[in-house]
Amino acid sequence: MIRPVETDDLAEWKRLRLALWPDSTAEQEETEVERFLAGYPSPTLMAAFVCVRPTGGLCGLVEVSIHDRAAGCETDRIGYLEAWYVDPDYRGTGVGRELVERAEAWARAAGCLEMASDTNPAYPVSPAAHEALGYSGVERFFRKDLR
């Protein structure tokens, strides 16, 4: 079952975020989820949805926001997948698709005509997962550390 994240989901939501971003800390993730639950930056600019396991607990999350620009996009109100994670034992079951479709519906209801997302080499399965849902790669970015 896909539903908006709730206050009671704090521990499981934090667990999913730590699985997605293992270089983060529990304290950082707790701060992030508490800020979100307190309404930051704004319920009209960001949403989070989770998938509930039939046996209890959560097995996936998607966090979506609204950006005014994104690589390859043509409009100034873009739904943006900020986070998308499904526990390994639920991958390939349709949970990831359902989560993204829920995020897209939220963005569409908020007036967005496009969706965007990003990924990096730390997530080798991510490009294929995005493409399976109709996303296409639009640009390649580079950076250089000047320190």
What positions do the PLM features span?
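Conserved acetyl-CoA-binding loop-helix of GNAT-fold acetyltransferases
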Residues: 82-86, 92-105, 128, 132
